[in-house]
Amino acid sequence: MKVGVLGGGQLARMLALAGRPLGLDFAFLDPAADACAFALGRGLQGDYDDPACLDELAEFAEVVTFEFENVPAAVTERLAAR
């Protein structure tokens, strides 16, 4: 299964460390170019509301989850529409 994660920090890294042995593949969207989770999957560096990054994440992922709770509602609506 391919999992998209909004956020690429410590929690996203721990999620990937737990999921990779189960055969899960990950993509992370984070504004920081050096997000620590990027080492464990596909790293998408960009703002959370960047349409191109969101589309790329949606193309990759079968399911999307969040690393943190402050994701703009418009972002989740855009992903849900895909």
Protein language model regions, located:
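ATP-binding N-terminal substructure of ATP-dependent carboxylate-amine bond-forming enzymes
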Residues: 1-82
